[in-house]
């Protein structure tokens, strides 16, 4: 989720209408686009969550966006402040530096 949000997912609107409301036009990463993951299951019981469950969905995506932005800054010296971060946006920022 975080990788797609940072690099490819972009909702497009024209006069309030969504122009890319399907998975053909709205680009999300496929499994082949993402790195291999090593998953570790940790058994625990949280009395606050329903049936002892803990949140495990949205929380882990938060560090992905700034990590990618900082990696780009370290590599080419430009700060990206708009998502998704695309090659053409990076190229434009690099040209603005010169």
Task: Please state what every model-predicted region is.
Residues 1-98:
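Cofactor-binding beta-sheet edge motifs in enzyme active sites
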């Amino acid at each position: 989720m975080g990788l797609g949000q940072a690099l490819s997912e972009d909702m497009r609107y024209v006069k309030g209408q969504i122009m890319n409301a399907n998975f053909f036009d709205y680009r999300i990463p496929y499994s082949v686009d993402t790195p291999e993951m090593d998953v570790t299951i940790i058994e625990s019981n949280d009395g606050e969550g329903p049936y002892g469950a803990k949140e495990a969905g949205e929380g882990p995506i938060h560090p992905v966006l700034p990590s990618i932005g900082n990696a780009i800054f370290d590599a080419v010296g430009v700060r990206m402040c708009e998502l998704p971060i695309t090659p053409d946006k990076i190229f434009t920022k690099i040209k603005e530096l010169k």
